[in-house]
Swiss-Prot record:
Residues marked Positions MEP for the nucleophilic attack (site): R150, K206
Record-annotated site: Transition state stabilizer: R17, K24
Protein name: 2-C-methyl-D-erythritol 4-phosphate cytidylyltransferase
Natural source organism: Haemophilus influenzae (strain PittEE)
InterPro entries: IspD, IspD/TarI, IspD/TarI_cytidylyltransf_bact, ISPD_synthase_CS, Nucleotide-diphossugar_trans
A GO MF term: 2-C-methyl-D-erythritol 4-phosphate cytidylyltransferase activity
NCBIfam families membership: ispD
Keyword Hydrolase: no
Enzyme Commission number, as recorded: 2.7.7.60
Function summary: Catalyzes the formation of 4-diphosphocytidyl-2-C-methyl-D-erythritol from CTP and 2-C-methyl-D-erythritol 4-phosphate (MEP).
Biological process per Gene Ontology, one example term: isopentenyl diphosphate biosynthetic process, methylerythritol 4-phosphate pathway
Catalysed reaction equations from the record: 2-C-methyl-D-erythritol 4-phosphate + CTP + H(+) = 4-CDP-2-C-methyl-D-erythritol + diphosphate
Pathway per the UniProt entry: Isoprenoid biosynthesis; isopentenyl diphosphate biosynthesis via DXP pathway; isopentenyl diphosphate from 1-deoxy-D-xylulose 5-phosphate: step 2/6
């Protein structure tokens, strides 16, 4: 049976580090919100059959957007893990795999999705890039304790790609155990799996701080040329 590919975008966060007057996914670049740019990437990828968008219950902005019929809204949770799980819980398709992607990563390119979808191992896979900067471990006073060996360190990105049933079980268990789930792979790891690392592009940045906006605008402009 051919697997179906569904995208889940958790978009219920407030993005406090952006210091903006609205959640960062609703900031505007090149005439569209960050969220719309990100949705466009998934909507234009032929293999994605549906997009599930998890938004805050009292989100005042989502109703102002013109959403494609392929997009299904679900109520987000208080954490990323809960929002993603809420999205997974409405998926009824058999043999479905899910691409979980940050709403504030608008510069994703289809070639990187291609590489993820080439993975058929049920351990799953995530986009990531090898760490190139020197990494320091700090103490509580923000002083350097040691320099870490970066030779086997990777920076996790999204999309992260897993069978729906495996990710659903892993997130449910992790949440029940009170685990620190910072991305989907961390829940999968706790369940005993070893997801593949797929080398992605460094321009697939997550807009987190004000200075990221100009860089995202540059990449989006370049990608449209």
């Amino acid at each position: 049976m051919a697997r179906s590919i569904i995208a889940v975008l958790p978009a219920a966060g407030v993005g406090s580090r952006m210091q903006a007057d609205k959640p960062k996914q609703y900031l505007t670049l090149l005439g569209k919100t960050l969220l719309e740019h990100t949705l466009d990437v998934m909507l234009s990828y032929p293999a994605v059959s549906k997009i599930i968008l998890a938004v805050s219950k009292d989100d005042p902005y989502i109703s102002t957007l013109s959403l494609d019929p392929k997009i299904q809204l679900v109520e987000g949770g208080t954490t990323r893990a809960e929002s993603v799980l809420n999205g997974l819980n409405v998926i009824a398709e058999k043999n479905a795999w899910v691409l979980v992607h940050d709403a504030a990563r608008p510069c994703l390119q289809h070639a990187d999705i291609d590489k993820l979808l080439a993975i058929e191992d049920k351990q799953g896979a995530i986009l990531a890039i090898p760490v190139t900067d020197t990494i320091k471990r700090a103490d509580n006073q923000q002083c350097i304790v040691k320099t870490e060996d970066r030779s086997q360190l990777w920076q996790a990105m999204t999309p992260q790609f897993f069978p729906v049933d495996i990710l659903r079980d892993a997130l449910s268990t992790g949440i029940q155990q009170g685990a620190n789930i910072t991305d989907e792979a961390s829940a999968i790891e706790l369940a005993g799996f070893r997801p593949h690392l797929v080398a992605g592009r460094s321009d697939n940045l997550k807009v987190t701080r004000p200075e990221d906006l100009a860089l995202a605008e540059f990449y989006l402009t370049r990608n449209k040329l």
